[in-house]
Swiss-Prot record:
A single GO cellular-component term on record: endoplasmic reticulum membrane
Coiled-coil intervals: none
Assigned keywords, A-Z: Endoplasmic reticulum, GPI-anchor biosynthesis, Membrane, Transmembrane, Transmembrane helix
Pathway: Glycolipid biosynthesis; glycosylphosphatidylinositol-anchor biosynthesis
Designated gene of the protein: GPI11
Family: Belongs to the PIGF family.
Protein name (Swiss-Prot/TrEMBL): Glycosylphosphatidylinositol anchor biosynthesis protein 11
Membrane topology: Multi-pass membrane protein
Compartments (UniProt record): Endoplasmic reticulum membrane
InterPro entries: GPI_biosynthesis_protein_Pig-F
Function as written in the Swiss-Prot or TrEMBL entry: Acts in the GPI biosynthetic pathway between GlcNAc-PI synthesis and GPI transfer to protein.
GO biological processes: GPI anchor biosynthetic process
Amino acid sequence: MTTKKRPVGKKKFVSFSDDDALSRTGRLPKNLPQHGSPPVYVRRTWQTIPFHLIVLSYWFIKHSNGYDVRKCTWLLVPCQVLYLALQFNPATVYGNKILKLNYALLAVSGVTCILLTIPCMLLVVLFGAPFLEMLDKTWLLSLHCCVLSYPAVYSVLNSDFKVGFFKKYFISIAVGCWISCLAIPLDWDRPWQEWPIPLVVGAQLGAMFGYTFCSQL
């Protein structure tokens, strides 16, 4: 007596995302790196180019009053929220779906970024930043970097903590910040060489590169 084999269906997965908040997309790219199941990636389109960072960097370098890092950071906050809502999140694909914007998670991600300033500041200090002398400026630099990473932080939380794909955005900000340190010891005596002005610009350039080129084709 022969028995019929049951057809093997597609493997199911558990997601913490609300199915009602999902909309279908097309097929997944063939060259998509796997960072767990279901995969998550950001489509590389003109939509993910952070035009606001280009404008903000130009304003900070050319027109800000004494390279005001504090004002630049406060201006960056709403820009990053709008960039996430209107550009980055619509290009983020989770499995074969696009997650709709989670307004509660926007606030949670903001709080997360503030909490991340502490380990970020410690990391900056370990790399040789002044601690006791310029603690407020070092914290402002850390806050600026964390705000730059806000879209990536939100996406990690919104895709069930799949850090694998989004770590490249954090790395690009850190590398840009680190490379810009080379401008500080130069014997030029320029006002923009003061701590942490070069690192703020470097972090912005790193974020521009990351959000523009680190997405998936």
